[in-house]
């Protein structure tokens, strides 16, 4: 009932201009007390290039099959496509990483907090109460998570009181998203307990304090994580180095190119194993026309094998 009440709150208020400076760009978005969200039409407009179906809230829904395929991606494979598209601000790093051996893949569910301002919070809480929501908290957003989501939280790098989850809410997030993951430009608490839960997480710091002195200002709106603007529904891919946020319109191309990159690396190492060539003769492009033709034939054969295997699953 609380989640349904939130949707009612989100959908019932009139559209107004942005109250906060960062949101001026998105004047069509709806402001509901201090809780700001995009309507389904807003999300559709701002992610219009997505080729995929959408959730009821308007977020692009990258297919489950592509999520599974994306578990094999590395940061370098993603970079190869995005830099060609001139999308050079899609990567964030410098995190503490929980379970770095476990790839993190899912659809971005974005949440924004700002430093507490009591007069704004009072109005927000009053309006929330009118719609059956006792408080606007971190759990307001967490309770909306779905399978395949990665919880993306802009807590403006806050350490003390910037703890989006402890072990209990981290466990709930793991169950709700089916081990999707968490990225927070902020902190977590109960690190010992969280470390035992099988879900990847990227966080700036750990701190024993509960979340506080902040206010929830956005759900499924553009948020900033490091130097990245993250949109709801972006494909989130995390590895040992950091996190990429891939716009949906590039997902298929990234995955296809990744196959080619892996095959190229596979062939290159085979040639190095033969011990007959200098590195410059093979990498990154074979200099000998016969070797180049050999590689192209190998690439074609392996692509056919890989795609046949995927079609059989």
Task: Go through each PLM region and give its residues.
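Boundary at the C-terminal end of the N-terminal hydrophobic targeting segment
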Residues: 31-33
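N-terminal secretory signal peptides that target proteins for export/translocation
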Residues: 1-11
């Amino acid at each position: 009932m609380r989640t349904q009440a939130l949707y009612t709150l989100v959908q019932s208020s009139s559209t107004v201009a942005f109250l906060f400076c960062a949101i001026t760009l998105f004047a069509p978005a709806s402001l509901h007390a201090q809780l700001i969200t995009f309507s389904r039409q807003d999300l559709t407009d701002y992610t219009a290039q997505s080729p995929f179906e959408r959730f009821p809230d308007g977020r692009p829904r990258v297919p489950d099959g592509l999520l599974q395929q994306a578990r094999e991606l590395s940061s370098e494979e993603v970079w190869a496509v995005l830099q060609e598209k001139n999308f050079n601000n899609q990567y964030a790093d410098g995190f503490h990483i929980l379970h770095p051996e476990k790839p993190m893949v899912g659809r971005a569910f974005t949440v924004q907090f700002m430093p507490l301002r009591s007069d704004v919070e009072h109005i927000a809480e009053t309006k929330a109460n009118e719609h059956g929501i006792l408080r606007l908290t971190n759990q307001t957003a967490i309770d909306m998570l779905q399978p395949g989501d990665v919880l993306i939280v802009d807590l403006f790098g806050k350490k003390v009181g910037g703890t989006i989850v402890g072990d209990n809410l981290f466990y709930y997030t793991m169950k709700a998203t089916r081990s999707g993951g968490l990225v927070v430009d902020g902190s977590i608490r109960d690190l010992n307990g969280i470390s035992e839960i099988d879900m990847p997480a990227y966080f700036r710091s750990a701190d024993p304090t509960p979340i506080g002195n902040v206010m929830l200002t956005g759900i499924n709106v553009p948020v900033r994580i490091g130097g990245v603007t993250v949109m709801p529904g972006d494909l989130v891919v995390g590895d040992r180095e950091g996190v990429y946020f891939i716009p949906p319109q590039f997902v298929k191309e990234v995955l296809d190119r990744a196959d080619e990159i892996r095959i190229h690396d596979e062939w290159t190492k085979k040639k190095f194993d033969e011990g007959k060539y200098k590195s410059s003769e093979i990498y990154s492009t074979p200099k000998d026309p016969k070797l180049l033709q050999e590689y192209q034939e190998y690439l074609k054969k392996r692509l056919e094998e890989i795609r046949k295997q995927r079609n059989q699953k």
